[in-house]
């Protein structure tokens, strides 16, 4: 009996040890997941307690490996936008990859925020002034904490933002791989009309009138007056379109950034963008970027009503006097932007 009793006692001790080990492991697992779900809180420079991304999760982790097991509708939407760009690049490889290798000069539109590991490709006439303001605040390059305190002209001073072309090749490759890259796009012809209205119908834009207006009038207007040739301040939209579709124009020099195509400014067939925001959902998409960057607790995208904004109805009116032939040629110039960013052919177009 004694050997049997000793054996039972020994087995009981083993069972208790195994149970204690399992319980301890279970408690450790609970603590681990609690720490994952409740990252350390730090105080941001604006005096508000928010979750600080540094030392925890990067924007790329937040985007592609969210803590929530189920993807949000927003994440699914942006995945669809990424897929649209990829599919368009693949289907139009000959057209979209005319250049196989990018040079540092091709990266001058990509603004870098080191602190939050963000890269933003700015596209003129797609809320780029406000996004440059935000990038100035995020990167700490300036004296401002409120984006709307930054004068518009100061947001466009190149020294106030660091762009990707300022880095060495290894540094460029590292940031393209590790940082969250995003851009904002707009219906191509609405953006084009917005650029025309801003640069050619406003009297204060004398530099554009001199640089481009005089050239457009000289090339496209018969019997132009000497005053028009000298000032270049009364360019008609029809003349602007004729200038854009003229093969000589792009052979002479690249388009100005305000009417250059997005795929030529940001190179989405060479650079994988993690987020494609749209002007039509500007506030929602912008605040999603800020949330992924871990700053939505104290920074929001600036919103204000702009009565001079170019609308779809306005764009329709501008295209009424453009011939079907010129509309077709202009669509070919911006075709990749329409396809990549899933904009349908406008109803007002009369394509040949």
From Swiss-Prot:
GO terms for biological process: apoptotic process; carbohydrate biosynthetic process; cartilage development; chondrocyte development; developmental growth; embryonic digit morphogenesis; embryonic limb morphogenesis; embryonic skeletal system morphogenesis. Residues 38-352 are lumenal. InterPro entries: Carb_sulfotrans_8-10, Sulfotransferase. It is a single-pass type II membrane protein. Glycans are attached at residues 205, 223, 321, 342. Residues 1-16 are cytoplasmic. 3'-phosphoadenylyl sulfate binds at residues 124-130, 186-194. It is found in: Golgi apparatus membrane. GO terms for cellular component: Golgi membrane. The keyword Transmembrane helix applies. The chain crosses the membrane at residues 17-37. N-glycosylated; required for activity and stability. Belongs to the sulfotransferase 2 family. This is Carbohydrate sulfotransferase 11. It comes from Rattus norvegicus (Rat). The gene is Chst11.
């Amino acid at each position: 009996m004694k050997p049997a009793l000793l054996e039972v006692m020994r087995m009981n001790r083993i069972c208790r040890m195994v149970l204690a080990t399992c319980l301890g492991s279970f408690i450790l697992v609970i603590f681990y997941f609690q720490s994952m779900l409740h990252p350390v809180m730090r105080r941001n420079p604006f005096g508000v307690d928010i979750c600080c991304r540094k030392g925890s999760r990067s924007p790329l982790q937040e985007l592609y490996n969210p803590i929530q097991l189920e993807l949000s509708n927003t994440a699914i939407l942006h995945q669809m936008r990424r897929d649209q760009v990829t599919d368009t690049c693949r289907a139009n490889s000959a057209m979209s990859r005319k250049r196989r290798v990018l040079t540092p000069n091709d990266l001058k539109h990509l603004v870098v925020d080191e602190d939050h590991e963000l890269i933003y490709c700015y596209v003129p006439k797609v809320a780029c002034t406000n996004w440059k303001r935000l990038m100035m605040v995020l990167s700490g390059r300036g004296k401002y904490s409120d984006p709307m305190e930054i004068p518009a002209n100061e947001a466009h001073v190149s020294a106030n933002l660091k762009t990707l072309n300022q880095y060495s090749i290894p540094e460029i490759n590292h940031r393209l791989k590790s940082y969250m890259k995003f851009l904002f796009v707009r219906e191509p012809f609405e953006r084009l009309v917005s650029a025309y209205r801003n640069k050619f119908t406003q009297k204060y834009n004398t530099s554009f009138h001199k640089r481009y207006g005089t050239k457009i009038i000289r090339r496209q207007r018969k019997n132009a007056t000497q005053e028009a040739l000298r000032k270049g301040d009364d360019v008609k939209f029809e003349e602007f379109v004729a200038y854009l579709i003229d093969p000589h124009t792009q052979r002479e020099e690249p388009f100005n950034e305000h009417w250059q195509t997005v795929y030529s400014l940001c190179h989405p067939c060479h650079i994988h963008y993690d987020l494609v925001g749209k002007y039509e959902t500007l506030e929602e998409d912008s605040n999603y970027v800020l949330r992924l960057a871990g700053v939505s607790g104290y920074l929001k995208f600036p919103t204000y009503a702009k009565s001079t904004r170019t609308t779809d109805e306005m764009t329709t009116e501008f295209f009424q006097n453009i011939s079907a032939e010129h509309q077709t040629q202009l669509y070919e110039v911006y075709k990749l932007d329409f396809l990549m960013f899933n904009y349908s052919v406008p109803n007002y177009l009369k394509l040949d």
